[in-house]
Amino acid sequence: LNYVPRYRTVLKSEELSTVDENNWKHCFVINKLDHMIYTVMWKGQLVRINPKNRTAEILLKKISNVATGDGGKAGSDSYIAFSPIKGEENVLYVSLADFHQIWRVDVSKITPEDKDTYNGESYAGKAIYEGVMNGKGWEDGLLKNAKFRHPRQICFTDDGKMYIADSGNSCIRVIDTTM
């Protein structure tokens, strides 16, 4: 028996030929409904991968509308999770660690026309409204008032509570997504 790991690559179209140049991903998740793999690249592209034929497609060119001040060259580590709430299983939550914010996207409602213009919905983090530098820190409160400092991994309980590993503040934060 040969236990050598198999190297599998994603088959990229012409549009995706350079998507991974100076770009990477930190996490991926499988959607329970469509059985596709989703990831958000460092530069913000939402990518869907079909695991059966290994083809990929860019669903959105950029999650968030963060102005980085460098012509869009800066990116963010992204950590993602689908909602467990019945009826919202296609809602993907995206934690943008370097921007101190959380965004969400309903992947079932994305159309080809959205690719260039839609950035998802801002969800939590004062940095969305006050900017990356002013909005980071430590503050609990409502979604728009919460301050994060490098929010990373996201996970959910069955009743819709989102737990966020806020690594810069060395704590676990909780958001009730049903409110």
Which functions belong to the PLM regions below?
Residues 30-31, 37-43, 92-98, 164-168:
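Conserved beta-strand positions in repeat-built beta-propeller and related beta-rich domains
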Residues 1-26, 53-80, 112-152, 168, ...:
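Gly/Pro-rich loop segments of beta-rich domains
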Residues 30-34, 82-89, 156-159:
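Residue-level detector of Asp-centered blade-edge/turn motifs that repeat once per structural unit
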Residues 2, 29-33, 40, 47-49, ...:
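Carboxylate-rich, polar loop motifs that coordinate divalent cations or form catalytic acidic clusters
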Residues 151-154, 162-164, 172:
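Hydrophobic packing within well-folded, soluble alpha/beta domains
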